[in-house]
Each structure stands twice: as C-alpha cells, then as structure tokens.
Amino acid sequence: MDKIELEKIVREKIKEMLGDSGDEFMVEASGRHIHLSEEHMKHLFGEDYKLTPVKDLSQPGQYACKERVRVIGSKGEFSGVVILGPCRNETQIELSLTDCTTIGVKGVIRESGKIEGTPGILIGVGDKFVKIDKGVIVAQRHVHMTPEDAGRLGVKDGEIVKVRVNGRRPLIFDDVLIRVKDSYKLSMHIDYDEANACGFESGTTGSIYRK
C-alpha cells in the first residue's frame, strides 16, 4: 500500500467517524501547482496533446496530471510543478509565500480565479516556454462546502471566518474564505506554509471558531 492509498483510507475513515452532522471537517494541504489554459497547454505540449490524469482530487472532477512544468522567477525556479486538470480559461499558478520569496515573485494572496493585478512568470516544458503577465497567486485559505453544509454550519458563500485547526500544533486561522457550491465536497484547503505552522498530518481536522 503506497502513501496516497493510505492517506485516502485515513480520510475516508475520519469522514465516516465524523458523519454528515458533525461540525468538524477535513483539512488538506496543497503544494505548489499550476492550472493551465487550453491555449498554453497546447503551446507547451502540442496542438493535439491531452493531459494524463493520474490521481483524483478531493473536489469532484478535479485531478492531478502526470505531466510537469518548470516555473521560473527572477531569483530561481521550481521544476516538477504538478499540473491540475481540467484546463481553465486562464492559467493560474499557486505558490506559498515561501515559494514566492525563493524564486523572486511577489506573493499576492488571492481567491482562486481572481488573478487581475497578480504577477506573471515564465513557464517551461523542455524547449517550449510561455510567459504570462498575470496568474501567480498565494491562494487564500478556504473551506469548500455544499449549500447543505453551509446551512448546517451557519455560514454563507463569500463569508470570512476563523477556523480552529486541530493539528499537532493547534491554532486558529483567521481570514478563511467560505466557498459554497452544489458540487463541492466539505474540506478546508491550506498551503504548505500554513500546514507547517499547525503541524499538519494526514487526518487533521478543523472547525469554525466563533468565540
């Protein structure tokens, strides 16, 4: 049994124990990754190329791909950056604040999809490159949920809340965005900087903090 399979079993077991009526939800840590537009994907990989899904993500319809890219800033670069599918209307790269400092890109905290006024970067695959003038974000920490979840937890789409995360170093995160959609699966997303701060490990849970 590999690590991915083990983490999936742990997540499912915790969800089973919490049930649909609990106030706690799963917390997931996301590493650096990229969402490519169809145009940029074809430029980097070829006109008729199709990305290769290798792992389903927790949010329905989203997946990690086999293909990787380089992202190149003024002070350095990251190779092996995972592509998440399917393609989006605009290319977006999600880095942590530490990542941004490392490669010389300004770290702008934004909700996913809101990329106006964000920095650009150079993206490479082999001898093919694409330079984007916007799209690099530090993703605002957020909780995905359905309308039913939102009603049960007493929150609404777009609301900013505090969340207590029960990691090995429990802490309360402020400025957490609530994202509500019928297709969403209840879970909180943080990046690796935030994961390290709370002592994240597989099975970490969180809850809305109201005190």
UniProtKB/Swiss-Prot annotation:
One biological process term in Gene Ontology: propanediol catabolic process
Q: Which GO terms describe its cellular component?
A: bacterial microcompartment
Amino acids binding Zn(2+) 1: 33, 35, 94
Q: Which terms in the Gene Ontology molecular function aspect does this entry carry?
A: acyltransferase activity, transferring groups other than amino-acyl groups; metal ion binding
InterPro entries to which the protein is assigned, alphabetical: PTAC
Reactions performed catalytically: propanoyl-CoA + phosphate = propanoyl phosphate + CoA
> What keywords were assigned to this record?
Acyltransferase, Bacterial microcompartment, Metal-binding, Transferase, Zinc
Broad class of the protein's primary localization: other
Superkingdom as given in the UniProt entry: Bacteria
Top-tier EC class: transferase
Instruction: Name the PANTHER family for this protein.
Output: PHOSPHATE PROPANOYLTRANSFERASE (PTHR39453:SF1)
Provide the E.C. number(s) assigned to this enzyme.
2.3.1.222
Binding-site residues for phosphate, renumbered to this chain: 88
Report the pathway entry: Polyol metabolism; 1,2-propanediol degradation
Output the lineage of the source organism.
Bacteria, Fusobacteriati, Fusobacteriota, Fusobacteriia, Fusobacteriales
First and last residue of the signal peptide: none
What protein name does the entry list? Phosphate propanoyltransferase
Residues annotated as binding Zn(2+) 2: 142, 144, 189
Q: Record-annotated residues binding CoA?
A: 29-31, 75, 196
What cofactor does this one take? Answer: Zn(2+)
